[in-house]
């Protein structure tokens, strides 16, 4: 239980980051409805994470999913000036907040796959695929354990 952590302990800091990254996903998908704009999801994720002083990764984003795993649109996890596309019923999107305990900057290691924070701070990533509907979005990738806890 996060509320039972010792203040300032590494485990407490880690657990809070993980839970808040997860919650930022749910804050974002409150706006994942047909007729809304993509930036509303992005802004909600970023605003929530930044309210705790976290760095929101800007070099990696969520994406559309269709006949290919990674498709347009790109879905940032931070507030943008542009509104982005209007969401349509039937769209499938991978919403994946990536939040750092420290600065938002990341770098790729020599294997061109592993991503680490530039300041060596802790980082968390939470991802699910959603289906846009006229009402609440449908989360397509929740685990059985997550479904039980909701």
Regions found by a protein language model. Give the residues of each.
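Active-site cores enriched in adjacent His and Asp/Glu residues with nearby glycine-rich loops
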Residues: 32-70, 85-91, 102-106, 135, ...
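Charged, cofactor-coupling segments
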Residues: 9-10, 79-150
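ATP/adenylate-binding site constellation spanning eukaryotic-like Ser/Thr protein kinases
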Residues: 8, 22, 62, 92
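Single conserved hydrophobic/aromatic residue that forms the stacking wall/gate
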Residues: 1-8, 12-13
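Short alpha-helix boundary/capping segments
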Residues: 16-17, 118
């Amino acid at each position: 239980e996060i509320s039972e952590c010792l203040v300032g302990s590494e485990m407490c800091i880690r657990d809070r980051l993980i839970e808040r990254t997860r919650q930022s996903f749910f804050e974002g998908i409150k706006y994942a409805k047909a007729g809304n704009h993509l930036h509303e999801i992005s802004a909600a994720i970023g605003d929530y994470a930044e309210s705790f002083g976290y760095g929101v990764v800007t070099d990696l984003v969520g994406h559309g999913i269709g006949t290919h795993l990674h498709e347009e649109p790109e879905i940032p996890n931070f507030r943008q000036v542009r509104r982005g596309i209007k969401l349509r019923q039937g769209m499938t999107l991978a919403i994946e907040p990536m939040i750092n305990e420290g600065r938002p900057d990341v770098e790729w290691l020599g294997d061109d796959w592993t991503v680490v924070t530039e300041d060596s701070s802790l980082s968390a990533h939470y991802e699910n695929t959603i289906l846009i509907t006229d009402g609440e979005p449908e989360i397509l990738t929740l685990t059985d354990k997550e479904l039980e806890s909701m």
